[in-house]
Amino acid sequence: AQDTAAVEQAMRRTGTLDWANRDVRALSGGERQRVYLAMALAQGGTTILLDEPGAFLDVRAQFELLDLLRSVAAGGKAVVLVMHELPQAMQYADRIALLGGGRLLGCDTSTALAATGAVDRVFGVRLCRAPDGVWYVKAEG
């Protein structure tokens, strides 16, 4: 009964409860991503590791997922994401590990990492922050 309750709660959090009786193979890629997150939440571990969690999701669903992961982290779980959407990572992550050329180039808060200029050098873009705090990139040149 406790396992069933954990699964139901995880499915409610991820908006997947209506799909409980559907074959996972019949789900879209984005729907599967949400089901996999529900599975991770239901297991009750202390850490969630996700590789490109926004893949296959439309823009709105990507931000809804990031908001959900933020609340999961606020609840005490460690949430580790591998992602290539730089502005989203800068906006949502408490800490960022910047990789380039197979090496760790820096690991810090968004603000501290941006101040080093490493992000700009690695990606050949200029990392900027709007007055409202939202991060964005400008292509150089």
Per-range role (PLM):
Residues 83-84:
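H-loop/switch region of ABC-family ATPase nucleotide-binding domains
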Residues 96-109:
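H-loop (His-switch) and adjacent beta-strand-loop-beta switch element
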Residues 48-52:
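Catalytic Walker B motif of ABC-type/P-loop ATPase nucleotide-binding domains
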Residues 2-19:
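Conserved ABC ATPase "signature" region
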Residues 89-91:
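A short, surface-exposed alpha-helical micro-motif characterized by mixed small hydrophobic
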Residues 121-141:
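ABC ATPase nucleotide-binding domains
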Residues 23-27:
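Conserved ABC ATPase signature
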